[in-house]
């Protein structure tokens, strides 16, 4: 049975994740006008694009909301972000620069805590600003149902009646004015921005075009480090970790993890650290592009991985990177609380993170330009005294030991040579193999045939769309498409 409502449930309470922007404001007013009972829930996630988050719920009252609540999600979001950091749960990277999954982290927390707040008020229907082409519609759906199995979903922007009447910013603003309701006429930006305490996402509109670069974005957590007119002074910073958690910055301990992250953001931000331009694969396997900021997470990540490399052996590092990447994709898909994710997360936090204790000093310059000045810790596996190229009093092994070790390698080298000789005899090396294998085998059995041009386009095309589908597709939502 579908949990998604396609028409307004008149007479019932509907919870709306309320941002105070044009789209959610008009949605609340329209639902009240049409007979539903809107209740708004605003998440305080430390978002840098809303400096006065405390005032947002009061705005909802003016549009007819029966319940207006501000839910403080910052502590939970910081904790989940620290867990992701300890696990290296970041799977998207370009040119060595990672995306720190800051939006998926935020959705896991808000999608859970807002629905729980609604449940306390007896609200069983939930709506948010995610569009049907993006990731968030599925993330919120999964987390919402995990928090409340009886939840039903209503999104005005998937309701043909709503979109017919209020399909774009112009129609929305005119509707509010016609009904005597306040309208904050903010300037429409060339791209959409979504932020929380861990980072900011810039996407959609002009940024969908790959000939538009990162330099068109105005950072909200950092500075335009690419602009030579922006003065950025060199700065040294020391970050301390204990058992996989950051505990100090420049020797200072903080009253809460939230305060520590805010300080890390401030330091990384004034250097433009942690900005990246990514092409990624959405949940639905369509590619999208985003420009991301995460100055504090980037700073902590540099320090954490420096310590991880100093402490753990090669196989542990391989597991950390491989499983961390898998966990990052699960989080991206809205599966951060699924059993398979919890299993990976617990293993990495327990066997990788808890051993990570130490301090790293960095010299920050512009953007990703930094130097590591010092690395200290009580349990490093790095022992230069044992492997020095100079004469040492107590080396780990001597030349005769190494000769013996090399001799023991003869067996596996011989095995490798034997396999290569066998492959030559079979025609796998040096000559075409007489028996088709791989794609050639599939072609020989008829599973892969002629591939005429244009087939991929035919598969991806939706065909002739109905008027209603076209209208929903063109609905202009200022929240973007993530």
From Swiss-Prot:
Catalyzed reactions: L-citrulline + L-aspartate + ATP = 2-(N(omega)-L-arginino)succinate + AMP + diphosphate + H(+)
Principal cellular location given in the protein's record: cytoplasm
Superkingdom classification of source: Bacteria
Region (Disordered): 461-482
GO CC annotation: cytoplasm
Entry's localization field: Cytoplasm
SUPFAM superfamilies, per the entry: Adenine nucleotide alpha hydrolases-like, Argininosuccinate synthetase, C-terminal domain
Enzyme Commission identifier(s): 6.3.4.5
Residues that, per the record, bind L-citrulline: 99, 135, 139, 192, 201, 203, 280
Stated name of the protein: Argininosuccinate synthase
């Amino acid at each position: 049975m579908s949990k998604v409502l396609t028409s307004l449930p008149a007479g019932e309470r509907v919870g709306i994740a309320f941002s105070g922007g044009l789209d959610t404001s008009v949605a609340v007013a329209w639902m009240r006008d049409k007979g539903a009972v809107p209740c708004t829930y605003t998440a305080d996630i430390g978002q840098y694009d809303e400096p006065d988050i405390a005032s947002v719920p009061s705005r909802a009252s003016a549009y007819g909301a029966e319940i207006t609540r501000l839910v403080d999600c910052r502590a939970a979001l910081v904790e989940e972000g620290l867990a992701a950091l300890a696990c290296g749960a970041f799977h998207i990277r370009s040119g060595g620069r990672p995306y720190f999954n800051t939006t998926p982290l935020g959705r896991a927390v808000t999608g859970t805590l807002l629905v729980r707040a609604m449940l306390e008020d007896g609200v069983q229907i939930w709506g948010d600003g995610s569009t049907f082409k993006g990731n968030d519609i599925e993330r919120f759906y999964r987390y919402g149902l995990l928090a409340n199995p009886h939840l039903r979903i209503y999104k005005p922007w998937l309701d043909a009646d709503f979109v017919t009447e209020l399909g774009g910013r112009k129609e929305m603003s005119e509707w509010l004015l016609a009904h005597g309701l306040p309208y904050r006429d903010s300037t429409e930006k060339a791209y959409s921005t979504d932020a929380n305490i861990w980072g900011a996402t810039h996407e959609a509109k002009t940024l969908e075009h790959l000939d538009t670069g990162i330099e068109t974005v105005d950072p909200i957590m950092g500075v335009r480090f690419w602009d030579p007119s922006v003065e950025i002074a060199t700065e040294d910073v020391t970050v301390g970790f204990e058992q996989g958690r950051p505990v100090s910055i420049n020797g200072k301990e903080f009253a809460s993890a939230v305060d520590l992250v805010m300080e890390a953001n401030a330091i990384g931000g004034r250097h433009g650290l942690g900005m990246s331009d990514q092409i990624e694969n959405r949940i639905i396997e369509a590619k999208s592009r985003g420009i991301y900021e995460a100055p504090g997470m980037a700073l902590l990540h540099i320090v954490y991985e420096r310590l991880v490399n100093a402490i753990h052996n090669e196989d542990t590092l391989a597991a950390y990177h491989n499983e961390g990447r898998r966990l990052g994709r699960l989080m991206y898909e809205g599966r951060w609380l699924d059993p398979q994710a919890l299993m990976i997360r617990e293993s990495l936090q327990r066997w990788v993170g808890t051993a990570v204790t130490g301090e790293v000093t960095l010299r920050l310059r512009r953007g990703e330009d930094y130097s590591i000045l010092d690395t200290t810790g009580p349990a490093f596996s790095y022992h230069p005294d044992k492997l020095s190229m100079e004469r040492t009093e107590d080396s780990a092994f001597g030349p005769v030991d190494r000769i013996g070790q090399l001799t023991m390698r003869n067996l596996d080298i011989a095995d490798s040579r034997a396999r290569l000789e066998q492959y030559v005899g079979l025609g796998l090396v040096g000559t075409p193999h007489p028996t088709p294998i791989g794609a050639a085998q599939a072609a020989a059995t008829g599973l892969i045939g002629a591939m005429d041009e244009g087939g991929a386009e035919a598969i991806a095309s939706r065909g002739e769309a109905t008027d209603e589908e076209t209208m929903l597709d063109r609905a202009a939502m200022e929240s973007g498409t993530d």
